[in-house]
């Protein structure tokens, strides 16, 4: 079986954040996960280990692979279920499995921002490049996936450079500010706390800082990085360990860390609400897995929003750019066809290689035979003639045998094929006497 492309995954279209956080891969787990995935196929009859890459973000977890194993689809879904200890019947309804051209089209759309919650957002492209880099370091990236991703990045650049897909997009950060303005009439009068110091927190800090909040604080596990971000926006840093004791000081809390467990629990928020005398707290949890226990959202005077909640506001901005979407989809469709042509060409490489190997083996055998004839004193012209006749007979033996064995439509197809190989071959009617 030829190498086949396959994408297995879940995203914000198919699964809620409660499930997405359970199948997310922390960065430090991706290389070991790729190793275990490849080991799944060691006992299978397919001769080649699969190529694989894992893309894990707030909105999606996807496994891209290239394999010649016919059972790859079911094996990949079963592996994802087993790895995360999620019952297969619970995970399966939310999983999509995209073969060949569908996998290519999906990769192009994801990198171009067409499949994002924030239409046209650029962060996903960097995340995909990081996924490819990690797969390369893990030794799980081969010819097929490497070519797929290089084409993917080129298509994303073309889409973003020739369409308005990223223009006037409502980012998650901007959506968070809009929601805060629904709770607090003036964000400028509020104290804002950011937990984390990654790209998403940086974007949120940019948008909230533009509102001129009363105070801006950054709490991060790495104090130096948190202080650097806070200084950039005229704020201050605070140790993450101080969060439980100081949570009541803040009106707005935005969190996005890489923690695999919640860092804000129900009890801590209950104490903060009590200390605030029930003044409202606006909380945004942009992390997957979530940073804030979901039960917090049930508390009176707490307004908790997740990435899925912000999606509704984001989609309002997406609707106005459908012309750009259509233009981008047209570009992608053309590039998908181009890539599939390359993939089809790759599928004949093993056949061509085998033909060369067979022909070379025949050549070497006949040359050795000719050398022996010359060594015993045979006439060189006779040796050359014998060599050429032997090569001719052996090289056309396969095609002529196939023609003799074929019947009906198969025979006609083979005859047409041979005419293509040997352009001056006569038609069957041309062999009759005239």
Swiss-Prot record:
The record's listing under InterPro entries reads: 4pyrrol_synth_GluRdtase (IPR000343), 4pyrrol_synth_GluRdtase_dimer (IPR015896), 4pyrrol_synth_GluRdtase_N (IPR015895), GluRdtase_CS (IPR018214), GluRdtase_dimer_dom_sf (IPR036453), GluRdtase_N_sf (IPR036343), NAD(P)-bd_dom_sf (IPR036291), Shikm_DH/Glu-tRNA_Rdtase (IPR006151)
Q: Which domain of life is it from?
A: Bacteria
UniProt keyword NADP present: yes
Site Important for activity — annotated at 106
The residues the record assigns to binding substrate are 57-60, 116, 121-123, 127
Q: In which pathway does it act?
A: Porphyrin-containing compound metabolism; protoporphyrin-IX biosynthesis; 5-aminolevulinate from L-glutamyl-tRNA(Glu): step 1/2
Please name the top-level EC class of this enzyme. Answer: oxidoreductase
Residues reported in the UniProt entry to bind NADP(+): 196-201
PROSITE patterns referenced in this protein's UniProt entry, alphabetically: GLUTR
Protein task: Catalyzes the NADPH-dependent reduction of glutamyl-tRNA(Glu) to glutamate 1-semialdehyde (GSA).
- Assembly and binders: Homodimer.
PANTHER family to which the protein is assigned, alphabetical:
GLUTAMYL-TRNA REDUCTASE
Q: What is this protein called?
A: Glutamyl-tRNA reductase
Q: Which organism is it from?
A: Burkholderia pseudomallei (strain 668)
């Amino acid at each position: 079986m030829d190498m086949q492309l396959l994408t297995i995954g879940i995203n914000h279209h198919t699964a809620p954040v409660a499930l997405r956080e359970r199948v997310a891969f922390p960065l430090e787990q991706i290389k070991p996960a790729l190793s275990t995935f490849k080991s799944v196929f060691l006992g299978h009859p397919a001769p080649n280990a699969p190529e694989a890459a894992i893309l894990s973000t707030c909105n999606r977890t996807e496994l891209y692979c290239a394999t010649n194993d016919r059972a790859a689809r079911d094996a990949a879904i079963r592996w994802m279920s087993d790895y995360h200890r999620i019952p297969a019947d619970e995970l399966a309804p939310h999983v999509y499995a995209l073969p060949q051209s569908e996998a290519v089209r999906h990769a192009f759309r994801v990198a171009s921002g067409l499949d994002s919650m924030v239409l046209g957002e650029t962060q996903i492209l960097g995340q995909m490049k990081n996924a490819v880099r990690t797969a390369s370091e893990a030794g799980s990236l081969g010819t097929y996936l490497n070519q797929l991703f290089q084409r993917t990045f080129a298509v994303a650049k073309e889409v973003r450079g020739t369409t308005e897909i990223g223009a006037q997009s409502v980012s998650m950060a901007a959506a968070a500010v809009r929601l805060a303005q629904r709770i607090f009439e003036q964000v400028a009068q509020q104290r804002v706390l950011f937990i984390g110091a990654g790209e998403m927190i940086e974007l949120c800090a940019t948008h909230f800082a533009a509102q001129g909040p009363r105070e801006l604080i950054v709490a991060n596990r790495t104090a130096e990085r948190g202080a650097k971000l806070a200084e950039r926006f005229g704020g201050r840093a605070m140790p993450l360990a101080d969060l439980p004791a100081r949570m009541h000081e803040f009106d707005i809390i935005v969190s996005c860390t890489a923690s695999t467990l919640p860092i804000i629990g129900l009890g801590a928020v209950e104490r903060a609400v009590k200390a605030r005398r029930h003044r409202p707290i606006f909380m945004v949890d942009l992390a997957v897995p979530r940073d804030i226990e979901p039960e917090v959202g049930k508390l009176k005077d707490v307004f908790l929003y997740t990435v899925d909640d912000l999606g509704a506001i984001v989609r309002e901005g997406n609707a106005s750019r459908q012309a750009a979407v259509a233009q981008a989809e047209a570009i992608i469709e053309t590039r998908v066809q181009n890539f599939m042509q390359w993939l089809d060409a790759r599928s004949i490489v093993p056949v061509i290689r085998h033909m060369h190997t067979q022909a070379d083996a025949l050549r070497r055998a006949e040359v050795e035979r000719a050398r022996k004839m010359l060594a015993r004193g045979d006439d060189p012209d006779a040796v050359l003639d014998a060599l050429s006749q032997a090569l001719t007979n052996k090289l056309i033996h396969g095609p002529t045998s196939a023609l003799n064995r074929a019947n009906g439509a198969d025979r006609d197809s083979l005859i047409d094929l041979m005419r293509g190989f040997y352009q001056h071959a006569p038609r069957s009617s041309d062999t009759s006497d005239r």
